Each structure stands twice: as structure tokens, then as C-alpha cells.
Amino acid sequence: MRQILLFAALAAVLALLLVSCGGTKDKPVPTEEDAPDKAAYQKISAEEAYEMMASQEVVVVDVRTREEYDGGHIENAVLVPNESIGSEMPKALPDKEATLLIYCRSGRRSKDAAQKLLALGYQNVYDFGGVIDWPYELVKEG
């Protein structure tokens, strides 16, 4: 009698498992086309950023402080300190369709700035990290 009860309990548990793991006939599996459009910045290397600067129209955005910028920055970079990026579009970046190449000193602020710029509606945001990893020439003001 005990074996029959144990067998019945095991069969009931197995039946519950099979029912709870039912197929997805009623629900189609989501695909990339079904996913909502989520804007995301792209992380690229300094070398990739350099190639983009040489081959297409881009806006290079330095998100460090004025003092850091004056100490040496990438040629033609626009200064938009990370701390100044808030709920309004930065005046130095009027075109939300422009390709933006973002950098800071080490990569932390550029990541933060890239996320904030996406939230403001910028479409083509690339983060290439910090100027400490920039193997090319920097220019100084003055």
C-alpha cells in the first residue's frame, strides 16, 4: 500500500511539472524585430574613433572639466563637461542626428555622458573611453 501511495505522489508531481513546463504555442517567441527600439551608445576603441575622425563627419566631445581640457585635448574637440549635461540639450551640440564621439580622462565620465546624451535624444553616440588611452597627439589651448 505504501508503494502505491509513493507511486501516486510521484506521478502527481511529474504531471504538475509537465503541465507547468508547457510549450509556447500560444505565445510567439520574441524576435529582434519585436523588441522595442532601445537607443544605446556604442563602445569603441581609440583607434576606431581615430579612423572615424579621418573618414567621416563627426563631433568629438570632451566631457572633462575646463582645466583638464586646457591641459591637452583632442584636436577640434568640443568641451561639454559631463556635469553640465542635464535635462536640456547642450548648446554646443545642436544636432541630435550628428555622430558624437565622447571621451573623458579614464572612461567613467564618458560612459555617464553617453547615457545622458541618449536620454536627451541623440541618436549616434560612440564612447571611446579615456584620453589616457589615446595614442595620438593632443593639443593645448594658448
What is each residue range found by the language model?
Residues 2-10, 16-47, 52, 70-99, ...:
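Rhodanese-like catalytic fold shared by cysteine-dependent sulfurtransferases
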Residues 60-62:
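Structural scaffold elements adjacent to functional motifs in cytosolic proteins
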Residues 65:
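Short, glycine/acidic-enriched loop or turn micro-motifs at the edges of active sites
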